Amino acid sequence: HCRHKIFNAEWEIDNIKEEKSLFDLIKDTSKKNSRELISAYKDNSAVIKGTREKVLEPSNDNLYLEKEYELNSIIKVETHNHPTAISPFPGAATGSGGEIRDEGATGTGAKPKFGIVGFNVSNLRVNEKNDWEKTLLLPNRIASPIQIMIEAPIGAASFNNEFGRPCTLGYFRVLETAFINNRAFGYHKPIMLAGGIGTIKSRDSLKGVITENFLIVVIGGPSMLIGLGGGAASSMSSGESDESLDYASVQRDNAEMERRCQEVINSCTCKDENIIKFIHDVGAGGLSNAIPELANDTNLGIEIDFNAIPVADKNMTPMEIWCNESQERYVLAIGENDLEDFKSICKRERCPFSVVGKTVNEKSIKLIDGPTSHVDVPLGMLFGDLPKTKIKTVTKDTKEFETLEPKIDLENDLELVLRHPSVSSKQFLITIGDRSVGGLTVRDQMIGRYQVPTSNYALSSSSFISKRGEVAAIGEKPQIAIFNPSASLR
């Protein structure tokens, strides 16, 4: 849902205009090694070519059968930093929840398999401060690092647990430098990283092609006055926006509703012909973003019956109904002849749904409320070539590490290093989550008979029958990136 105004910005460094944006540099990796890549940077997650596998799946007659498909892998990583900084538990929970929805809304429907969670924060200042920890200066609305690390991991683990997805990979980094020449580095605004791996059938790996008169359906919970303006708030520097707007922008999680939606998606993709022809999840910007996205991607327009949008709070204004970011919703396009079948699936899974509109040939978004039209805008106004952000900067010499003093207390210093959160055991972040739910986990974080949390990777099986699967690992070195970004990547 992001327009990436920073990553797509035009950069001028030392009075020299850069040819590529940051996003261009990111995409270079896939351009140079795209052999097994089916889709990247154009859907809700990336799709990587897989293998032919046997799976257990219900037939059209609702009997479990052994079927064989070309199964591809999907991968997604994003961050949910601003909400986690403002309200750690719901911020991290909806970060994981939003990433799960992105996986499910890939192509014409996919299955999330295992999760990835990471945290970067400044010094924790647990009880008494350590010698290297200075006084923490934060805006009142920003949670402290220790508060974030007490609440946010529970939020992420809670959502993964309730949804029914194992979280078998992650990292935790504490970094905050001292001031040198009035500059310091740290994570007062944290990084909350949410990612995951899933599977998708080859036939479902790309979005479908639809025409006019396809039905637009919203599945999931009703509209509530939750998460208003989160897409804008997350793009501001911390402390820039109004404090009340900051808190209003944080979404609230409902993992059970998301599980119901995922079961509907799974049931649709089990059919001999997938009922879902197009799907997007509802995230930042709410329906005001998701529905125009669907219209733009299908090269069509959409007419919406405003009264058909499910609403829990009748006092909400049209703007609030259209723009709220109530979680656990998806927007789908289905054929009119599939509606009864779709209704029966939603009823069985107890998943709320509503047919809110249809596709039209005129490339515009119309919100119709009886004789009144709240919104009638051409897609070109929403998705046209927007002016790019221009950023000027200069390179600065970075002070190298100071050499260690010859007189060191090895035993004391070793203890300080080993108890530093970036070095010490991460077991407290691991055992809060179910690592085997779903039955496809092959390698989680725990190793050996004593279950020591030292695994370097996560591994899952493609199916209950297969001996092949997906492996993922993650690495980060911000303390080196401060001085040598290239070395930190190597």
Question: Regions from the language model: what does each represent?
Answer:
Residues H1-R490:
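Glycine/proline-enriched, intrinsically flexible loops and inter-domain linkers
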